[in-house]
């Protein structure tokens, strides 16, 4: 088969997958509502059909806005499913507002909730099957794309290796093209940049990933200009991986493309989702633990003289000072420029306080901090101001922890990095996990951390 025919077949297969996705989404939505009505003993009425159509239209509009029906090849399934459920949730919320005007509101609301839950499962399962099916086809030579890397950046090599290690993605690596250096060429070398242009013109390559240094701007511009005379897709790998980037993404500022190196993941819709998550969880948890809070408050009051609640100054989001609430666990309270970290068998800790610290129950009042907006359920744990000033000079990127709100529990704590940080290495590991959390943030990641906290995050021998 000629290269041109391979290219056309790849485009046809990609379009076919997109059509299958759209058709399956529509089918699952209507089938889900019909099934819920059947199980509930209700007729599938004209009103159900009308609202389902409106929901579908909204879902398709959101799909266009978020570019949902693009190719998800090479993108993690969790990312695709998160956007799928986000669009579906917003669509159902919109249609539920229409149902609110119905006379039999309670019954219709139950139907809508059941439809939402059933269809959510169906959409995710169907997308998983499509991914598996597409992967099988690509493993057998269908829907393949021939790709090449231009340049010798490490990021380009990493991308090439990932394509080779994941054949189900359907990317077949032609090789690496760059002008040879005095040290010779690697085994992956397929030719110089001029050879790349000739191969692209001959239809041997579908995608070209440019992985060249920032200082090679003139060469990059020349190569892009030459590739404009071909039909291959040209993608640029930004030379930003020399930096320890934090939640980078492509943005536009007054028509100028920019790539943030250090930024917060909590902007726009993500910020609203995170705040909604905090308010709902904190409210439910406070209602559930209110008897426990009263018992702990009484125990603290009887254990030693002093207030029940201790308010500590900590750095919040963007490094702004906040007051963090805790049950008092010590006979003395330190909140000065110099803070002595609690150690094992610390004489300042009361007997009740020792139990509270080991079980993290002393931190329960921080759910009030969450409601007031100073903290989050999940995030990097807040450190003493004195420790912040100390470690920001010793650990690169330490202050990047403050690109999100501090949390009651966090990814570092789940992985065992809590309690006394008596060595620099321990603090470095804690910061490493905190920054990993910020890079990988999602609502589902938060839920995972909350779930793990219930089983392994509260009691820890390192806490005293």
Curated annotation (Swiss-Prot):
Organism of this sequence = Escherichia coli (strain K12)
Summarizing the function annotation, the protein's role is: Is the initiating enzyme for colanic acid (CA) synthesis. Catalyzes the transfer of the glucose-1-phosphate moiety from UDP-Glc onto the carrier lipid undecaprenyl phosphate (C55-P), forming a phosphoanhydride bond yielding to glucosyl-pyrophosphoryl-undecaprenol (Glc-PP-C55). Also possesses a weak galactose-1-P transferase activity.
Enzyme kind, highest EC tier: transferase
Phenotype reported upon loss of the gene: Cells lacking this gene show a non-mucoid phenotype.
Where found in the cell? Cell inner membrane
An annotated GO cellular component? plasma membrane
Q: Kindly list the residue ranges recorded as spanning the membrane.
A: 16-36, 39-59, 81-101, 105-125, 279-299
Its annotated pathway reads: Exopolysaccharide biosynthesis; colanic acid biosynthesis
Catalysed transformations (reactions)? di-trans,octa-cis-undecaprenyl phosphate + UDP-alpha-D-glucose = alpha-D-glucosyl di-trans,octa-cis-undecaprenyl diphosphate + UMP
One biological process term from GO is: lipopolysaccharide biosynthetic process
List residues in topological domain: Periplasmic.
Answer: 37-38, 102-104, 300-464
**Name listed for the protein in its UniProt record:** UDP-glucose:undecaprenyl-phosphate glucose-1-phosphate transferase
């Amino acid at each position: 088969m000629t290269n041109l025919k391979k290219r056309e077949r790849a485009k046809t297969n990609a379009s076919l997958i997109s059509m299958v996705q759209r058709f399956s989404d529509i089918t699952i939505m209507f089938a889900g509502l019909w099934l819920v009505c059947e199980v509930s003993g209700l007729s599938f009425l004209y009103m159900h059909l009308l609202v389902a159509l409106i929901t579908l239209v909204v879902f398709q509009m959101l799909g266009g806005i978020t570019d949902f029906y693009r190719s998800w090849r090479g993108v993690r399934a969790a990312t695709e499913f998160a956007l799928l459920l986000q669009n579906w949730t917003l669509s159902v919320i919109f249609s539920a507002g229409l149902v609110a005007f119905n006379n039999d509101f309670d019954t219709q609301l139950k139907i809508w909730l059941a439809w939402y839950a059933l269809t959510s499962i169906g959409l995710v399962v169907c997308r998983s099957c499509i991914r598996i099916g597409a992967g099988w086809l690509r493993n057998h030579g269908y829907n393949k794309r021939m790709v090449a890397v231009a340049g010798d950046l490490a990021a380009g090599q990493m991308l090439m290796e990932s394509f080779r290690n994941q054949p189900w993605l359907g990317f077949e690596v032609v090789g690496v093209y760059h002008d040879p250096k005095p040290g010779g060429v690697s085994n992956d070398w397929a030719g110089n940049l001029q050879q790349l242009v000739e191969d692209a013109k001959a239809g041997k390559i579908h995608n070209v990933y440019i992985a060249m240094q920032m200082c090679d701007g003139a060469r990059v511009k020349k190569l892009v200009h030459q590739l404009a005379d071909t039909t291959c897709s040209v993608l640029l790998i930004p030379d930003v991986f020399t930096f320890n980037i934090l939640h980078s993404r492509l943005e536009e500022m007054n028509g100028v493309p920019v790539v943030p190196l250090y930024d917060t993941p909590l902007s726009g819709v993500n910020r609203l989702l995170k705040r909604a998550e905090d308010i709902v969880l904190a409210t439910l948890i406070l209602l559930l633990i209110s008897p426990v809070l009263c018992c702990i408050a009484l125990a603290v009051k009887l254990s030693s003289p002093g207030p029940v609640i201790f308010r500590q100054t900590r750095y919040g989001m963007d490094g702004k000072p906040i007051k963090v609430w805790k049950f008092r666990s010590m006979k003395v309270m330190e909140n000065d420029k110099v803070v002595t970290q609690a150690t094992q068998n610390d004489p300042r800790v009361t007997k009740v306080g020792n139990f509270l610290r080991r079980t993290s129950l002393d931190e329960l009042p921080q759910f009030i901090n969450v409601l007031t907006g100073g903290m989050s359920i999940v995030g990097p744990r807040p450190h003493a101001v004195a420790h912040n000033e100390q470690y920001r000079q010793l650990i690169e990127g330490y202050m990047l922890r403050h690109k999100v709100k501090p949390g009651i529990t966090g990814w570092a704590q789940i992985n065992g990095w809590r309690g006394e940080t008596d060595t620099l290495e321990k603090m470095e590991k804690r910061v490493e996990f905190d920054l990993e959390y910020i890079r990988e943030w999602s609502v589902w990641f938060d839920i995972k951390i909350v779930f793990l906290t219930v089983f392994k995050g509260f009691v820890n021998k390192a806490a005293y």
